[in-house]
Amino acid sequence: ECLCRCSGLYFCLSVPEMMKSFYYPHRNAKNPINNADIIYTPDATVFKTDTSRPKLMDEKDWYDVDVITCAAPNLRKRPSNQFNQDNGDRSVKVSDKELLEIHKKRLTRILDVAALNGAEVVILGAFGCGAFQNKPEVVARAAKEAMADYLHAFKTIEFAVYCPPRDDT
């Protein structure tokens, strides 16, 4: 969400062809697990600060990033809400083993796309550990296992995971 607030990414993702090929199929499936489809968005311009109230940066400070979009499983008890209206009406039951495989597949696809597009630095997010209630230990294990084949593919792999000030875990 942060990238959508601070850059032109939202506008790239909300064009009719993206809605038709990516978002509408997800919504029509009404499956909170979603799927491993990916959108690669090169050169999304970041023009606002990454703060609680983003501010327009001086144009000389703008920069471009390539973004890989892939949906995480939505494991909420009530997956549909005002932000995810088409994730189905019922929660899904998925074992930790099944969830691990889902995450490994998606993370591997993300890393494949990054490598194929010549990325030197990859920054991964929490991938469902926040609002979608995926278990952090399962996602972390999937990331560790998926990254094993990419240790020399990138100069840096980082995790940008938001932690509120009151949470020091």
Listing of model-derived features with the role each one plays in the protein:
Residues 1-169:
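Macrodomain-like recognition of ADP-ribose-binding/processing modules
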